[in-house]
Amino acid sequence: MDPHGALFFYLCLLAAQVVLVETLSDLLVLMKRLEQPVGRGLSSRARHIHSLEQKLLNASFGGHNLTLQTNSIQSLVFKLSCDFPGLSLSSTTLTNVSQVRAPHAMQFPAELTKGACVTSRPAELRLICIYFFTAHLFQDDRNSSLLNNYVLGAQLDHRPVNNLQKPVNISFWHNRSLEGYTVSCVFWKEGASKSSWGAWSPEGCYTEQPSATQVLCHCNHLTYFAVLMQLSGDPVPAELQVPLEYISFVGCSISIVASLLTILLYAQSRKQSDSTTRIHMNLNGSVLLLNVTFLLSSQMTLPTMPRPVCKVLAAVLHYALLSSLTWMAIEGFNLYLFLGRVYNAYIRRYLLKLCMLGWGFPALLVLLLLMIKSSVYGPCVTSLSKSQENGTGFQNVSMCWIRSPMVHSILVMGYGGFTSLFNLVVLAWALWILCRLRAREKALSPWAYRDTAMVLGLTVLLGTTWTLAFFSFGVFLLPQLFLFTIFNSLYGFFLFLWFCSQKRYSDAEAKAEMEAVSSSQMTH
C-alpha cells in the first residue's frame, strides 16, 4: 500500500473511532439524563425513552453487540440476521452488571425474526434491550409496586413484534421468599392512562413461579416487562413483631387454660340439657382447637419439620377458624330465635343439625380445597415492612397457613366478614327490641340494664371483634394490630367469663325458685 493510501485508511479509521466515541458518549449522556427525576407527562418520560431507543437502533459500532451501563440503566444492542437461532441473556454473564442486584434473564425464541424476514431478507436486524433498575419512569395511576423495581424492555428494529407462537421468557429473581405474595407479569401499555404515559397490563403474558424466589414471565410480544407485587393489606412494621408475638402467645395460652376450665365447669354443671349451654360449649371447643393449632403453626415451619406436617397443621388451623366463625354465627342465630319469641318452637334434632353445620360444613370446605389443590396449605410468609438499608423493603415470618391469596380473601376475610356482619345485624335488632321494651316502662328496671348488658356482651363475644381485621390500613393499622391481637387471642378467656356469669345467674335463679316453692309449701 502506498503512503497516501495508508494515510487515507488511517484517517478513515480515526474518523470512525471519533464517531463511535461521540455516539457512545451521547448514549451515556441520555441514559444518565433518564436517571434524573422527570415529570409525569408523555412529553418528558416517553420522549426521553423513545429517544434512547432510536439512538440505540441507529448506533454505529464494530462487532456484533454493544453494552452500555450507568448506575441504574443498562442498554444492550445486538446485530441479528434472518438465520437467528435464538438468544439467552443472563445478568450473571453480562459484563458491567452489579452483583449486588438480584439476577434476571431474558430468552428470545428463533421465531423472533421470522416476521421481519417474510417479504425480504434484510442484511441486518437490530435487537435492543434496555434494563431499568428503577421504576420512577414507569409510575402508573395506582403507584404499583414492582419486584426489585426492575423494568426489562426489548425491541426488534423499528417494527412491532406480537403474537409469537413461542413466547419470550423473562425471569426475575429475589433474594427473599415470595410465598404469600400475589405476583403477576405485566407489560407497559402506552396510552392506557390519562394521567400518565401508560399503565401496566397483563395482556399476552403468563405468570409462573418455578420456586419461592423466582418469577418466570412468558409473553408473546416485545415491550417493557415487570412483575407487579400485590400485598394483602399494609405490611406489618417489623419492630412490632416481638410485642405482637408475645401478646398472641400469652393471650392464646390464657384462652387455652380458660377453655379447659370452661369444659370442666360444664361437666360439673347440673343444667347440661340446655341447648344454649351446649352451643356455648361447641363454640368453646372450636376456639380451643383454634388457639392450640395457632400456637403450633409457627413452630412447624422449622427446617427440621417435614413439609407434610406443616400442610396438615395449616388445614387444621383453617378448619378451626372456619368452625369458630360458624359457631359464632350459630350463636347469633340462636340469640335471634330467643329474642324473636320463637325459641320454644319445636325444631326436630335442633342441636344435631347445628353440630352438622358448625363442624361439618367447615370440614367439607377444607376437604374440597385439599382435593382440588392441596398446595394452598403449607408454610406461608407474613409481610413485615422494615428499613430500606438492605434494599428489600420487607422480611419474612413463616407460619403454617393458607398460601393462596384468593383462598385467603374468600374463605378467611369473606367468611369472617359475613359472620361479623350477621352478628352486627342481630345486635342492632336486639337493641331495637330492648329499646321498645324500655319505652313501655315508666322507669328503667334493673332487668333492662341486665338484658342490655347480656345482649351486648354475648354479641360482642360472638365475632364482632373480627371486624377489626378490615381496618388494617393507614392510620388504623397500629391500633388495629394491637386491638385485634388482644381481643381475639383472649377470646377463650372472654367466653369463660361469659359462661361463669351465666352459670351464676342460672344458679341464683334456680335458688330463688326453690325458695319460692319452699315458702309456698310452708304456707299450705
Swiss-Prot record:
SMART domains reported for this sequence: GPS (SM00303)
The Gene Ontology terms for molecular function here are: G protein-coupled receptor activity
Q: How does the record describe the protein's post-translational processing?
A: Autoproteolytically processed at the GPS region of the GAIN-B domain; this cleavage modulates receptor activity.
**Which domain of life does the protein's organism represent?**
Eukaryota
Question: What is the membrane topology listed in the Swiss-Prot or TrEMBL record?
Answer: Multi-pass membrane protein
Give residue spans on the Extracellular membrane side.
24-246, 306-319, 373-413, 477-480
Q: List the disulfide bonds.
A: C185-C217, C205-C219, C310-C400
Stretches in topological domain Cytoplasmic = 268-284, 341-351, 435-453, 501-524
Xref: InterPro entries: GAIN_B, GAIN_dom_sf, GPCR_2-like_7TM, GPCR_2_secretin-like, GPR1/GPR3/GPR5, GPS
This protein's GO CC annotations: plasma membrane
Give the recorded effect for Q230 to A/C/D/E/G/F/H/I/L/M/P/W/Y.
Answer: Drastic reduction in basal cAMP production
Record keywords, A-Z: Cell membrane, Disulfide bond, G-protein coupled receptor, Glycoprotein, Membrane, Receptor, Signal, Transducer, Transmembrane, Transmembrane helix
GO terms under biological process: adenylate cyclase-activating G protein-coupled receptor signaling pathway; cell surface receptor signaling pathway
According to the record, the segments passing through the membrane are 247-267, 285-305, 320-340, 352-372, 414-434, 454-476, 481-500
User: Where is the site Cleavage?
Assistant: L222, T223
Map out region (GPS) in residue numbers: 185-235
| Protein activity control | Forms a heterodimer of 2 chains generated by proteolytic processing that remain associated through non-covalent interactions mediated by the GAIN-B domain. In the inactivated receptor, the Stachel sequence (also named stalk) is embedded in the GAIN-B domain, where it adopts a beta-strand conformation. On activation, the Stachel moves into the 7 transmembrane region and adopts a twisted hook-shaped configuration that forms contacts within the receptor, leading to coupling of a G-alpha protein, which activates signaling.
Q: What is its main location?
A: membrane
Region listing for Stachel, in residue ranges: 224-232
- Tissues expressing this chain: Expressed at least in kidney, heart, brain and spleen.
Domain GAIN-B, chain residue ranges per copy = 74-235
Q: Where is the signal peptide?
A: 1-23
The role this protein plays is: Orphan adhesion G-protein coupled receptor (aGPCR). Ligand binding causes a conformation change that triggers signaling via guanine nucleotide-binding proteins (G proteins) and modulates the activity of downstream effectors, such as adenylate cyclase. ADGRG5 is specifically coupled to G(s) G proteins and mediates activation of adenylate cyclase activity.
Q: How does it assemble?
A: Heterodimer of 2 chains generated by proteolytic processing; the large extracellular N-terminal fragment and the membrane-bound C-terminal fragment predominantly remain associated and non-covalently linked.
Q: Which family does it belong to?
A: Belongs to the G-protein coupled receptor 2 family. Adhesion G-protein coupled receptor (ADGR) subfamily.
Descriptive protein name: Adhesion G-protein coupled receptor G5
- In the UniProt record, the gene name given for this protein reads Adgrg5
